[in-house]
Regions:
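Catalytic-core regions of glycoside hydrolase
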Residues: 1-258
Length: 258
């Protein structure tokens, strides 16, 4: 909300862009907007206070929060408020409108990224060095004149400009991260990027050089730091069970082979 209010949105206009609370993960992975909203003013205030309290509690336990990173996401009505910005339409996702995206190689991207991070700092303080951003999560429209290499370079550069110790958290999901995205992170990749291998148990990617439509230069995401993850109850599979024998084998094997 604070971010959008820097660009001629009223409080209510910015607030009403938010999806309902159950859908925030998908909104901030650039999949949808508005759906399930609007939320009340009271809810926004309560959510902010609760988040700040959670941050303090987690810090006391030595737990790092993964904050939101910025890869150019904007509302689909952004041109009504900022007509001079070059906007990339991102199409739809599951019958819903995806948020638009500004060009990361455009003249205004660095300014927008800095504004976003300052707005987030106002909300939560300087609480973490970990940031999540996933350009083209489950779709989106890649313009022919803007490569994943350029996007990765610009997103990481703007993040490190704000926080020199930042670590960009990227989900390994479907065909992401692409080879070009990883290569675009350049020399910073070793110290400032971490890949979450979300389906580490069911369908690991860390030991592959090919997944979906992606062909990598080397396994372990071209030698990038990564985290073995277990994502089981999604996609209509809500049962409380797990593959215990597979877990007992796969986790030690990952330690040995990585």
């Amino acid at each position: 909300i604070n971010f959008l209010m820097n660009y001629n949105y009223s409080f209510d206009e910015a607030k009403d862009w938010l999806a309902g609370p159950s859908y925030y993960a998908w909104q901030f992975m650039d999949n949808l907007e508005i759906f399930g909203g609007p939320v009340s003013d009271r809810w926004v205030k309560g959510r902010l206070e609760m988040a700040r309290e959670n941050q303090r509690w987690k810090r006391s336990l030595g737990i790092d929060t993964v904050l939101q990173g910025y890869a150019g996401m904007i509302p689909t009505d952004f041109a009504n408020h900022q007509p001079d910005v070059e906007i990339l339409k991102q199409g739809g996702w599951c019958g819903l409108n995806r948020p638009d995206m500004i060009r990361t190689d455009g003249a205004l991207y660095d300014e927008y990224a800095a504004t976003f991070y300052k707005a987030q700092e106002w909300a939560f303080g300087e609480t973490s060095n970990y940031y999540a951003a996933d350009p083209f999560h489950e779709g989106g429209i890649r313009p022919s004149d803007l490569s994943d290499t350029t996007i990765a370079s610009e997103v990481l550069d703007s993040l490190l400009e704000y926080d020199e110790d930042a670590v960009w958290m990227v989900q390994a999901w479907w065909s992401n991260p692409t080879n070009d995205l990883l290569n675009g992170m350049g020399e910073y990749r070793q110290d400032h990027v971490m890949i979450l291998d979300l389906t580490g148990l069911e369908a690991p990617k860390w030991d592959k050089t090919s997944y979906g439509s992606t062909e990598l230069d080397a396994p372990e995401f071209n030698g990038t730091d990564w985290v073995w993850c277990m994502l089981e109850n999604y996609g209509g599979n809500p049962s409380m069970d797990g593959q215990l024998a597979k877990m007992a084998n796969d986790i030690p094997n990952a330690y040995k082979q990585a």
